[in-house]
Amino acid sequence: MKRERLMSINKEKAEAAIYQFLEAIGENPNREGLLDTPKRVAKMYAEMFLGLGKDPKEEFTAVFKEHHEDVVIVKDISFYSVCEHHLVPFYGKAHIAYLPSDGRVTGLSKLARAVEVASKRPQLQERLTSQIADALVEALNPKGTLVMVEAEHMCMTMRGIKKPGSKTITTTARGLYKESRAERQEVISLMTKD
C-alpha cells in the first residue's frame, strides 16, 4: 500500500517545485549539499501524505462480536502530521475510547491504523480529532466515542510565538460521551491516568 501511494504522486512536479523553492529563498539547488534535496524532499512528502485519498474508516477491517459491553480505551497512539497552514509538522499522541454497542469491537491495531491514515495529510488537529471519532462511529456504531489528541505544533515552536513544549489538546465526543458529562469525565480521567 505504501509503495502504491509513493508512486502515485507527481514526482517530477514535486521535485521541480522544491528546486524552485530553494532558488526563491536564495539557495543554489545545484550545490553539492542540495543536489539531491528536491528528490529527497519529494519522497519524504509522499511518505508524510500517505493518508491522502484514504478514508480512516476503511482501516476497521476486523470487527468482532464479543460479550464485552464496557469501555475500550487505547492510549498513547503516537502520530506525526503536517499543519496545513504552515506545512510544518505537529506530533503527539491520540487516545481513543469507545463503548461497544451489541458487543461489536474491533482489533486494537485498527484504531492505531485509523489515526495513521487521518494524520498522514495536511491537517488541522481539530479536524484530525473529529475524523478519528467519525471513522470509529461509522465503522462500529458504538454507544459512545471519545477521542483526545495531544500535540506539539512546530508552527508554535519554531516560528511566531516560539513556545517550545506547549501542547494543544483537542477532544471530541459522540453518543453517550457527548450526552453525559459524568460518563465523559470518567473516560477522560482514565485516558489521562498514568
UniProtKB/Swiss-Prot annotation:
Single GO molecular function: GTP cyclohydrolase I activity
Record-given protein name: GTP cyclohydrolase 1
Catalysed reaction equations from the record: GTP + H2O = 7,8-dihydroneopterin 3'-triphosphate + formate + H(+)
Binding site for Zn(2+): 83, 86, 155
GO biological process, one term: tetrahydrobiopterin biosynthetic process
Parts of the chain that traverse the membrane: none
Top-tier EC class: hydrolase
Enzyme Commission identifier(s): 3.5.4.16
Cross-referenced HAMAP family: FolE (MF_00223)
Assembly notes: Toroid-shaped homodecamer, composed of two pentamers of five dimers.
Cellular-component GO terms for this entry: cytoplasm
Database matches in Gene3D superfamilies: 1.10.286.10, 3.30.1130.10
